């Protein structure tokens, strides 16, 4: 795992088209902004896991 330190307003790049910007820090919460092309799905981990669980529960036709 790559670990990076960023300050509010600073950005990191993932590939050529995805940016992650630190928008704010309040207590133990960090607000981040993700800018990605429409074809790149961006989800919180718990939402992604729910989507994957729903996909695995669907019966194939």
From Swiss-Prot:
Keyword RNA-binding: yes
PANTHER family on file: CARBON STORAGE REGULATOR
Entry GO terms, CC: cytosol
Single GO BP term: regulation of carbohydrate metabolic process
Organism listed in the record: Sodalis glossinidius (strain morsitans)
Protein name: Translational regulator CsrA
Pfam families xref list: CsrA
Compartments where located: Cytoplasm
